[in-house]
Swiss-Prot record:
It holds the Pfam family IBV_3A. Keywords: Host-virus interaction, Inhibition of host innate immune response by virus, Interferon antiviral system evasion, Signal, Viral immunoevasion. This is Non-structural protein 3a. InterPro entries: IBV_3A. The lineage of its organism: Viruses, Riboviria, Orthornavirae, Pisuviricota, Pisoniviricetes. Residues 1-22 form the signal peptide.
Length: 57
């Protein structure tokens, strides 16, 4: 009688952990994409500044 709710609770905790882990992975992927986009913006900004700087010489 006691074992059934306990095993149910364990399954519930495992499912919750799986959900949290998948959300965490999704957040990491989104963060990685955001960093990639930001780096591209910074890179293009630096390139345009360098071109402008060389054209002024």
């Amino acid at each position: 009688m006691i074992q059934s709710p306990t095993s149910f609770l364990i399954v519930l905790i495992l499912l919750w952990c799986k959900l949290v882990l998948s959300c965490f992975i999704e957040c990491l992927v989104a963060l990685q994409q955001l960093i990639h986009v930001l780096l591209q913006i910074i890179n293009s900004n630096l390139q345009s500044r360098l071109l402008l700087w060389h054209s002024l010489d």
